[in-house]
């Protein structure tokens, strides 16, 4: 069976990544691509690397006949996404890549994103899209909320450790480096080549990054009590990739064994041999996450490092993984490509 797919926001990085991935999916056909400001243009004009594909011309959302769509990916900015999704057919399966449906508490959404939620009915039904931990709910969901790329990386490290009770919940430090594509395709002064190249900088320092809302929600639910992590992201002059270094109080071997057991049967999350550390080079362009564990010279502490591609495993690859489950496909279909190297 061929599933008819629409992608809203196809002129952005995550939208283009979805097109790249779905083009190789044997049971999906892209029937509609929206790009409000680029309507009427071909995808080859907007993204020349997709020139070889036979794709629909970009259109406006209101030009799409959703009666002929089995599943819709929404790769629009937050706030815009909720306004669009609440107007879509109530039976349409949707995977949202924005932040609009990640937080279950409307007040938490207002706190972190600065505006009221206008699609509360859809927010209430949305399933959080961290595939490895919400598979059963995702299979039967109508609306799945993709995670933040930083939030996904941190959770792959910390969820099993919190659930197993093997680390001190009051002493978690997460230091994360993210490539510039995580900021999207819009023109911003700080993302100009001359501003970014040959340098790196911290941002959202002091606990202000919006993905902390996801950490608070997910970790506190796991622990059964409030859990807050100390999280500082850094922007690095790379196109793709996240490298997250997490410092925890706990026995390093126990941390390693807990993570190795948690992901032993996972197709996309891989725990390296003890003492090895991952690189963003080794996951680039793939749906894989690599995790490495090592001890520290300070007794009773462990260092856990995770690497993934922010556009693939951190966003569009995760979205396709979820869509496969929603449509009854094998979870790994269209996602088994090896990482690009060098």
From Swiss-Prot:
Gene Ontology biological process terms in this record: L-arginine biosynthetic process
Q: Which InterPro entries match?
A: AGPR_type-1, NAD(P)-bd_dom_sf, NAGSA_dehydrogenase, Semialdehyde_DH_NAD-bd
Recorded catalytic reaction(s): these are: N-acetyl-L-glutamate 5-semialdehyde + phosphate + NADP(+) = N-acetyl-L-glutamyl 5-phosphate + NADPH + H(+)
Listed CDD domains: AGPR_1_C, AGPR_1_N
For whether the record's keyword set contains NADP, the answer is yes
Q: Where in the cell is it found?
A: Cytoplasm
One cellular component (GO) term of this entry? cytoplasm
Tell me the pathway: Amino-acid biosynthesis; L-arginine biosynthesis; N(2)-acetyl-L-ornithine from L-glutamate: step 3/4
Q: What molecular functions are annotated in GO for this chain?
A: N-acetyl-gamma-glutamyl-phosphate reductase activity; NAD binding; NADP+ binding
Q: Does the keyword Transferase apply?
A: no
Tell me the superkingdom of the source. Answer: Bacteria
The alphabetical list of record keywords is: Amino-acid biosynthesis, Arginine biosynthesis, Cytoplasm, NADP, Oxidoreductase
Q: Record's Pfam families? A: Semialdhyde_dh, Semialdhyde_dhC_1
* Active site per database record: 149
The record ties this protein, via HAMAP family, to: ArgC_type1
Give the PANTHER family listed for this entry. N-ACETYL-GAMMA-GLUTAMYL-PHOSPHATE REDUCTASE, CHLOROPLASTIC-RELATED, N-ACETYL-GAMMA-GLUTAMYL-PHOSPHATE REDUCTASE, CHLOROPLASTIC-RELATED-RELATED
What NCBIfam families does the record tag this protein with? argC
Role played? Catalyzes the NADPH-dependent reduction of N-acetyl-5-glutamyl phosphate to yield N-acetyl-L-glutamate 5-semialdehyde.
What's this protein's name? N-acetyl-gamma-glutamyl-phosphate reductase
- What is the organism of origin for this protein? Ruegeria pomeroyi (strain ATCC 700808 / DSM 15171 / DSS-3) (Silicibacter pomeroyi)
């Amino acid at each position: 069976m061929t599933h008819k797919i629409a992608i809203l926001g196809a002129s952005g990085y995550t939208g283009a990544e979805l097109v790249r991935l779905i083009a190789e999916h044997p049971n999906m056909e892209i029937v509609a691509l929206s790009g409000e400001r680029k309507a009427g243009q071909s995808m080859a004009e907007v993204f020349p690397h997709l020139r070889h594909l036979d794709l629909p011309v970009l259109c406006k959302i209101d030009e799409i006949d959703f009666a002929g769509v089995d599943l819709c990916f929404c790769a629009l900015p937050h706030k815009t996404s909720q306004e669009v999704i609440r107007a879509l057919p109530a039976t349409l399966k949707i995977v949202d890549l924005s932040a609009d449906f990640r937080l279950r508490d409307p007040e938490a959404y207002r706190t972190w994103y600065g505006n009221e939620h206008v699609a509360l009915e859809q927010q209430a039904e949305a399933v959080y899209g961290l595939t490895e931990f919400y598979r059963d709910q995702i299979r039967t969901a109508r609306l799945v909320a993709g995670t933040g790329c930083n939030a996904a990386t941190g959770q792959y490290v910390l969820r099993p450790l919190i659930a197993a009770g093997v680390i001190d919940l009051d002493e978690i430090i997460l230091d994360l480096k993210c490539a510039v594509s995580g900021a999207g395709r819009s023109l911003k002064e700080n993302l100009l080549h001359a501003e970014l190249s040959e340098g790196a900088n911290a941002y959202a320092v002091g606990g202000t990054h919006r993905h902390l809302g996801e950490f608070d929600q997910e970790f506190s639910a796991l622990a059964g009590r409030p859990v807050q992590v100390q999280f500082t992201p850094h922007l690095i002059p790379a196109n793709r990739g996240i490298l997250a270094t997490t410092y925890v109080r706990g026995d390093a071997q126990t941390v390693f064994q807990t993570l190795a057991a948690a992901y032993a049967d996972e197709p996309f999350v891989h725990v390296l041999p003890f003492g090895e550390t991952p690189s963003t080079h080794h996951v680039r362009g793939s749906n894989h996450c690599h995790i490495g564990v090592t001890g520290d010279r300070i007794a009773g502490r462990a260092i856990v490092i995770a690497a993934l591609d922010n556009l693939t495993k951190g966003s569009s690859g995760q979205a396709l993984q979820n869509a496969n489950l929603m449509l009854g496909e094998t979870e790994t279909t269209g996602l088994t490509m090896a990482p690009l190297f060098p």
